[in-house]
């Protein structure tokens, strides 16, 4: 995949070249999307809109730390949707990992989560965030046990994953109507990079065959159900639905 690669570390150690080789990235000086290695982290920038800033994965500080410490925990909609109850903490495959936010919430309340991400740039961002998270004194121990990244296309990987998870979680890219600054910023950068999930409808059936208990699909409240398969079961929040489908028992 072609992208502009920029090293701002000043280290001169070739770390960016190693990273590019690992993820199959090719430097393109004229590309409007840039993957930038800074002294702190790896980030994605839209070069023609510098005011948007950089997008990076941070499980240790910022919004994710606040959500972990002060968020709803088991009361969060995604936790309810996957079926967390009492001692039941399902094993989850997040087949559309993105920046890993929902996967991190589930891991922070005790679920083991395998994240799938097919875009190599997004996978590199996730891997960078995980490396920093694993090294953190406060969360590193449980994060290594509970949150893993698999760089693969969900459409192919969903038929290969073993052991089977109890839950498959899907949050396909869907055009956002919201005007919130964060959504606008991230979505504009993200959609410039990966575009809409045009093949997302093809995920529902393999997800239902893989999950032993249920499939959870996050949708904006105005979006039709995935693959136009309606379900009466959903956890509804302001702005979103978590549609719930039966999996395939062992």
Curated annotation (Swiss-Prot):
Catalytic activity, EC: 2.1.1.242
Predominant place of localization: cytoplasm
Its job: Specifically methylates the guanosine in position 1516 of 16S rRNA.
InterPro entries in UniProt: 16SrRNA_methylTrfase_J (IPR007536), SAM-dependent_MTases_sf (IPR029063)
Matches recorded under Gene3D superfamilies: Vaccinia Virus protein VP39 (3.40.50.150), YhiQ-like domain (3.40.1630.10)
Binding site for S-adenosyl-L-methionine: 101-102, 117-118, 153-154, 171
One term under GO cellular component: cytoplasm
Highest taxon above the source species: Bacteria
Family: Belongs to the methyltransferase superfamily. RsmJ family.
Localization: Cytoplasm
Record field: catalytic activity: guanosine(1516) in 16S rRNA + S-adenosyl-L-methionine = N(2)-methylguanosine(1516) in 16S rRNA + S-adenosyl-L-homocysteine + H(+)
Keyword check for S-adenosyl-L-methionine: yes
Keyword Transferase assigned: yes
GO molecular function: rRNA (guanine-N2-)-methyltransferase activity
HAMAP family the UniProt entry points to: 16SrRNA_methyltr_J (MF_01523)
The protein's name: Ribosomal RNA small subunit methyltransferase J
Keywords: Cytoplasm, Methyltransferase, rRNA processing, S-adenosyl-L-methionine, Transferase
